[in-house]
Swiss-Prot record:
Its EC number is 2.7.11.1. Residues 447-458, 502-517 have a biased composition (Low complexity). This is Serine/threonine-protein kinase VRK1. The lineage of its organism: Eukaryota, Metazoa, Ecdysozoa, Nematoda, Chromadorea. Belongs to the protein kinase superfamily. CK1 Ser/Thr protein kinase family. VRK subfamily. Pfam families: Pkinase. It comes from Caenorhabditis elegans. One of its GO terms (biological process) is cell fate specification.
């Protein structure tokens, strides 16, 4: 039985990683220091490098000595891309720039017992592909045509040297300086082919060679790279740079389908090109269509008329530049017209619009805010209450009233603010006998006799109001602090919601001592005419969050987010609205915090003070 054949080696192997700082001695007695790797190719790795004793960075390509692509490129550089050859060509053509790199050094070195090939060329700023991706996949047409002009000059040099590039694309085009497209450089000669022995005889083994979406129809058929093929590839690239895509982009994984799509596209020219470049000018479409036309009419082995092509591209650049100059002028004119028009500032205040008749040419509208109303003095409260009444909101923008009407308004608003918050207290069953509750027709006042000596003069305490009597305020706060906290855990506590008496008809009670005793014996049913007593189980959030006369609950006022949604608040000017919301929410947050954090007190002290 014959021995099994060893598995075939891969066509191209990736080079081993060379450490940074490794020194390579060239045959020219120069030493180069390997820098960081910044890219990889089908043949190997690409590093930065410097010459020992110098700081200028260069590019070093490294691959195993058994690989072929870098060898092909080294041969091309040694034949036609030496620095002295390029300088001689520039003098002959009387040009100052040509978009081709030159060879600095090349050779072999051994790294970890592996023989490697290297080549050093100049380093450039960035690639056109990186710029295109940064711009969202496209390039400005003027920039694209400028790059195309540089590439045509580079291809002319290669074609005169009997070489076809065969792999023109944005990834193989570098910019010497960032943002400067007039000095674009064509690199990567791994697929470059010498055309002296070209014969129009397709070979299926060579079919679809190159970058599938850009490669020429000659390469799809299996022919060697040709001069006309380079122009066809450049035309495909211009389509890609203008639109960011190609009609056969989705078919890239199937080279045969891409080839069929390209044949149909070329057969339908120039209509198919116009469908792709809908947003471009006729000069641009005509230029690219002519590139396809010249490519198709040139024989496989013939050289392309570069002079005609460069003139087409130059004319298209000039027309694109002239079109680009007209557009900013038009935009500048429109901007000046917009500047002349006066745009009114956003405001919630009523605006008086006055039209100027002096200037007949420019119909400008002058917007003047109405005279600001005289600000009202703040009430005795620290925070400003926010009411939902539309009348209160409109008062800020109306003309100031007379002195007497303002005084009446202030007193009315002060009364409304006093009765704004309906308070909730909780009275334990054990202390009901010590309290005396009297009800009035419109509201209710809680009267608590302090002792037998003071029965001749009883006081009416309005719970939850800002009273001038310090003792009544103190008692109300103590009752609230103690029994509000205890109501959370003890079922014996009964919450009592007491509606506030109207300021118009306040009632006072002056009971005798005997009537006070009788009131102690009153049952909860007699008292319940104006006071609703509920057990802890029956307490609902609606009762705990009793709404005020303005229709806004204390919980809403304590929350800036909820307070901002109140319809009346939106009528305030923006700066004033934020200040009111901040002050109001801070006030009610402080009130809620004081109810929860203040210490408790003894029942006996409370009853004695009452």
């Amino acid at each position: 039985m014959p021995p099994k054949k060893a598995p075939a080696k891969k066509l191209h192997e990736l080079a081993a990683e060379v450490r940074v700082g490794h020194k390579i001695n060239d045959i020219s007695k120069k030493t180069f220091i390997v820098g960081k790797q910044f890219a990889t190719g089908g043949f190997g790795r690409i590093h930065t490098c410097t010459e020992e004793g110098k700081s200028q960075q260069m590019v070093m390509k490294i691959e195993p000595s058994t690989n072929g692509p870098l060898l092909t490129e080294v041969v091309v550089f040694n034949r036609i891309l030496k620095k002295e050859l390029i300088e001689s060509y520039k003098k002959k053509k009387k040009i100052s720039w040509i978009g081709l790199p030159y060879l600095i050094a090349n050779g072999y070195f051994t790294y970890e017992s592996e023989k490697m090939r290297y080549m050093i060329i100049p380093k450039y700023a960035t690639s056109l592909e990186a710029v295109r991706e940064t711009n969202g996949g496209t390039l400005a047409m003027k920039d694209s045509l400028t790059v195309a002009s540089c590439i045509l000059d580079a291809l002319e040099y290669l074609h005169e040297s009997d070489y076809a590039h065969a792999d023109v694309k944005a990834a193989n085009i570098l910019l010497e300086k960032q943002g400067v497209y007039s000095t674009a450089v064509l690199v990567d000669f791994g697929l470059a082919h010498r055309t002296t022995n070209n014969v129009d005889k397709p070979d299926k083994k060579r079919a679809h060679n190159g970058t599938c979406i850009f490669t020429s129809t000659d390469a799809h058929r299996g022919n060697n790279p040709s001069f006309r093929g380079d122009i066809e590839i450049l035309a495909y690239n211009l389509m890609m740079w203008a639109t960011g895509t190609l009609p056969w982009m989705a078919l890239e994984s199937s080279p045969e389908k891409v080839f069929d799509a390209k044949q149909k596209f070329i057969a339908g020219l120039p209509g198919t090109l116009q469908n792709v470049l809908k947003n471009e000018s006729s000069a641009v479409v005509g230029c690219i269509a002519s590139m396809f036309d010249i490519s198709m009419k040139t024989n496989y082995t013939d050289k392309v008329d570069m002079g005609k092509l460069k003139k087409l591209v130059t004319d298209a650049i000039q027309k694109t530049s002239s079109d680009g100059k007209k557009t900013p002028t038009r935009q500048k004119k429109l901007a000046e017209e917009d500047k002349n028009a006066v745009t009114p500032k956003r405001s919630t205040r009523r605006l008086a619009v006055k039209e100027e008749s002096d200037n007949k040419d420019n119909d400008e509208v002058e917007v003047k805010p109405e005279k600001k109303a005289t600000p009202r003095k703040r009430t005795t409260r620290k925070a400003v209450e926010v009411n939902n009444d539309s009348d209160d909101n409109e008062e800020q923008y109306e003309n100031p009233k007379s002195k007497s009407s303002r005084t009446q308004t202030k007193s009315k608003r002060a009364k409304e603010e006093d009765v704004d918050d309906e308070e909730e207290i909780i009275i334990p069953k054990s202390s009901r006998s010590r309290s005396k509750v009297q009800l009035s027709g419109e509201g209710s006042d809680v009267t608590t006799p302090s002792s037998a000596a003071s029965t001749s003069r009883s006081r009416s305490i309005r719970l939850g109001l800002t009273s001038s009597t310090a003792s009544s305020n103190k008692v109300a706060k103590k009752i609230e602090q103690k029994y509000k906290r205890l109501s959370m855990n003890k079922s014996s506590l009964v919450p009592v919601t007491i509606s506030v008496a109207s300021d118009k008809s306040p009632t006072t009670s002056t009971p005798s001592s005997s009537s006070g005793l009788r009131s102690k014996r009153k049952s909860s049913e007699d008292v319940g005419e104006g006071i609703t007593l509920k057990t802890q189980v029956l307490i609902t959030p609606a009762i705990k969050k009793a709404k005020t006369k303005s229709g806004i609950s204390s919980a809403t006022k304590a929350s800036p987010t909820e307070l901002r949604r109140v319809p009346g608040v939106r009528n305030f000017p923006k700066g004033r609205r934020s200040m009111i919301i901040k002050e109001t929410s801070a006030k009610y947050k402080e009130r809620l915090a004081s109810r929860q954090t203040k210490p408790t007190f003894d029942d006996s002290s409370c009853s004695s003070e009452v």
